[in-house]
């Protein structure tokens, strides 16, 4: 039970102990720290009770291994899950502070970047809320991927120093440190006791992995699970002898080598050193996490052969899949198991989630790099590969084409997805269409050989962050109309459908949307200096920047609309605000050029008085969870326009839907299931189907030049990329122009079918405008999107993982 007076005293005490100040003298940032420590005090009681329950009930634990955890701010989320948000807000008001302002002092933890990391965060929230024992396992990046600045329209990457003031919601746990080894060589000697060879790793560089634990609170159930992120430190901190001899570089050499591992998420791998660092990162957190999990298991259990009965490792994409070989190494070299015993334990303990259809994103490592950096692990993968090839040969005698396609080591590379599929007891896709494409296209040979492993788990999102916290006005309205059960049972939202023809309810629903649009318009004015009209259609595309996600199609259409208004100033046109938010990987030149184009178009369009503000273009800098929450709540239209067959699932589409924004999209990823739930009449679908795209890719027959030569308006749009309309440098966007029309090297012209879908997209946008003019009709669409979003909760996804893959039991936490 939350005690307000005790909480106020705790905040004052924290200010005194942490800063030697009275509360009146404290800065906003210091108040944030003090409030967070007071909240953590409450959480720690639950955390201890949860650990006690796990010790007593000995449940099976899932270790969710992910390169990214895009958590978002913790203070507000924890208060929501503790059901203490209102009381803390009130307590702080009595102390003279505004909780919203305090929340704004918290940096977004820079532990992830895109949908992969946000999914992992939603899953942790659902696991805790559903009373399942789980650990998240990742890396404590010091600077994240980067903080995005926009200068002269270009993305500039600066370090995201989120830890500079310390982070109150983490606990350093040096007593659980592990050693991780890189490089060296493997010595083989005969072991007379076992009657076989013993493999001894020597001459390695050792790094200390230090765990930092972050609490993951369940909603209103006293459960607190753990996200364990690993920091790297040298075994020997500081070489005083070298320092005294004047060799200052050598004195800190080991520290620098260790620190490099955890400095940034996804270091640029356009060069060899970057590739090596990425592999180091992956092995570092996987090895430390496996060592910790096995140590925890052995505290209560003597028989390592039964590890899989109490532990399961879920590998989130290919980044952690080195876990297969590392688990084998630990079981054989440290626990003394033979190959067959270790293989049985491993193949019952590891499961793999595939997150991409893009074959270039399925990680492959050069043999030379892998074998040099991880010599013993590479030996094990060689043996797994040898045995796997024998299994393929046994099933498909003489079919060398199969071996070529399925081998784990082939053509000088180690193929991590193949390793995960060969060893994992489960392989899942993340939307129904995605899983079907994996089974019938990308991983067809594996599916034919072992169909029992493959299953689908459509992604989901946590409504506690993306509605209850992100959109409190709508959350309160929903609770008034159908009660609070939707917070832990999202399909309850279906009850809202009865209000789809209730004019009063529809008006209230749209009034809330308008207030959220006003809030976002204020943010845009403060951060971008652009005045946008909240009465305009807020058309939003926020997501990682990649060519297949087709931000380029969106901005080319904006240019097309701009041309239409310029040529026909008298035409009826409903004002639009096109909102973009996206980070491009530091080494991804094309994606960065698209950001520049969006900003160059914005500069021209926003400053052209002749169009009378009918179009505004806004690029929101440094898109992240905390500003995403405002954006989802305010959007009218959800742009989900990836090339069909390329987006595995998407979860932004679900967040927009939950907040009452109809989808404008292709039949790709989870869009297919969204349309099934809400009805095609409440979405705006366009473009080639996935079958049509795959057919063109496999058989040819698409030439964008035909469209360019026959469609004058499309030709005009493309010519404006290179004729000085948006830059005095006519060569600036030449590469984007060329990518749409000219085949280069192995890349087809317009490989993401932007021109093929352009007219269909423009027509869908016209349908959006016509629908929006019908206020009641639009309100009904918006309300029904919220009402039909119940399927897309991560609670449902996690329950499916539990039922079909992990087989966990619920844990009941009872505080004293």
Task: Locate the predicted segments by residue.
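A conserved ligand/cofactor-binding region detector
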Residues: 1-816
């Amino acid at each position: 039970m939350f005690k307000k007076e005790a909480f106020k005293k705790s905040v004052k005490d924290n200010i005194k102990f942490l800063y030697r100040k009275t509360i009146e003298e404290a800065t906003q940032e210091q108040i944030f720290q003090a409030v967070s420590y007071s909240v953590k005090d409450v959480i720690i009681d639950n955390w201890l009770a949860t650990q006690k329950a796990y010790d007593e009930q000995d449940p099976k634990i899932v270790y969710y291994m992910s390169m990214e955890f895009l958590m978002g701010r913790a203070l507000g989320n924890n208060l929501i899950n503790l059901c203490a948000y209102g009381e803390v807000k009130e307590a702080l008001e009595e102390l003279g502070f505004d909780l919203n302002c305090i929340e704004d002092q918290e940096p977004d933890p820079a532990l992830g970047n895109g949908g992969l990391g946000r999914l992992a965060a939603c899953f942790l929230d659902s696991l805790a809320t559903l009373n399942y024992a789980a650990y998240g396992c990742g890396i404590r990046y010091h600077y994240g991927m980067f903080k995005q600045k926009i200068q002269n329209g270009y993305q500039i990457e600066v370090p995201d120093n989120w830890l500079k003031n310390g982070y109150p919601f983490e606990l350093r746990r040096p007593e659980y440190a592990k050693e991780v080894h890189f490089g060296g060589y493997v010595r083989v000697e005969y072991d007379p006791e076992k009657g076989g060879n013993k493999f001894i790793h020597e001459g390695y560089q050792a790094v200390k992995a230090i765990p930092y634990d972050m609490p993951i609170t369940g909603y209103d159930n006293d459960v607190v699970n753990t996200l364990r992120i690993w920091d790297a430190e040298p075994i020997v901190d500081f070489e005083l002898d070298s320092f005294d001899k004047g060799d200052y570089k050598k004195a800190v050499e080991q520290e620098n080598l260790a620190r490099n591992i955890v400095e940034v998420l996804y270091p640029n791998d356009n060069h060899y050193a970057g590739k090596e660092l990425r592999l180091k990162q992956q092995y570092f957190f996987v090895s430390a996490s496996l060592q910790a999990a096995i140590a925890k298991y052995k505290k209560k259990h003597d028989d390592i052969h039964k590890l899989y009965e109490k532990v399961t490792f879920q590998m989130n994409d290919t980044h952690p899949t080195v876990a297969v070989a590392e688990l084998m190494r630990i079981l054989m070299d440290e626990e003394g198991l033979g190959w067959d015993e270790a293989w049985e334990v491993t193949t019952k303990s590891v499961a793999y989630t595939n997150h991409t259809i893009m074959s270039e994103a399925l990680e492959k490592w050069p043999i030379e790099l892998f074998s040099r950096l991880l010599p013993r692990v590479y030996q094990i993968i060689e043996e797994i590969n040898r045995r796997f090839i024998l299994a393929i040969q046994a099933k498909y005698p003489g079919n060398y084409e199969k071996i070529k396609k399925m081998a784990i080591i082939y053509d000088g590379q180690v193929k991590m997805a193949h390793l995960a599929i060969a060893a994992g007891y489960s392989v899942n896709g993340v939307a129904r269409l995605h899983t079907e494409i994996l089974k019938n296209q990308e991983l067809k040979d594996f599916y034919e050989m072992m169909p029992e492993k493959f299953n689908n788990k459509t992604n989901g999102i946590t409504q506690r962050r993306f509605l209850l916290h992100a959109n409190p006005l709508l959350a309160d309205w929903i609770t008034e109309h159908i009660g609070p059960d939707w917070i832990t049972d999202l399909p309850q939202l279906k009850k809202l459908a009865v209000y789809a023809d209730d004019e009063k309810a529809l008006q209230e629903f749209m009034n809330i949307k308008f207030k959220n649009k006003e809030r976002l318009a204020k943010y845009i004015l403060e951060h971008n200096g652009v005045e946008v009209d909240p009465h305009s259609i807020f058309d939003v595309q926020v997501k990682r920047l990649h060519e297949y996600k087709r931000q380029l199609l969106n901005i080319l259409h904006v240019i097309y609309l701009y041309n239409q208004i310029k040529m026909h100033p008298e035409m009826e046109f409903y004002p639009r605000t096109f909102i973009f938010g996206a980070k491009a990987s530091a080494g991804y030149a094309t994606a960065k050029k698209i950001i520049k184009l969006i900003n160059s178009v914005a500069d021209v369009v926003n400053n052209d008085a002749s169009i009378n503000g009918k179009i505004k273009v806004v690029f929101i800098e440094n898109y992240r969870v905390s500003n995403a929450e405002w954006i989802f709540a305010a959007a009218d239209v959800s742009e989900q326009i990836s090339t069909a067959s390329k987006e595995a699932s998407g979860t932004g589409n679900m967040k927009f839907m939950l907040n009452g924004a109809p989808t404008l999209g292709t039949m790709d990823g989870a869009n297919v299931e969204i349309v099934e739930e809400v009805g095609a009449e409440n979405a705006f679908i366009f473009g080639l189907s996935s079958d049509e795209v795959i057919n063109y890719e496999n058989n040819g027959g698409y030439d964008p030049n035909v469209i360019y030569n026959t469609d004058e308006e499309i030709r005009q749009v493309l010519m404006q990329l290179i004729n000085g309309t948006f830059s005095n440098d006519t060569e600036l966007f030449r590469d984007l122009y060329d990518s749409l029309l000219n085949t280069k090297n192995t890349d087809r012209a317009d490989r993401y079918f932007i021109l093929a879908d352009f007219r269909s997209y423009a027509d869908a946008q016209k349908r959006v405008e016509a629908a929006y003019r019908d206020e009641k009709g639009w309100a009904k669409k918006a309300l029904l999107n919220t009402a039909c979003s119940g399927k897309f909760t991560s609670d449902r996804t996690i329950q499916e993982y539990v039922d079909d893959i992990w087989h966990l039991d619920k844990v009941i936490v009872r505080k004293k």
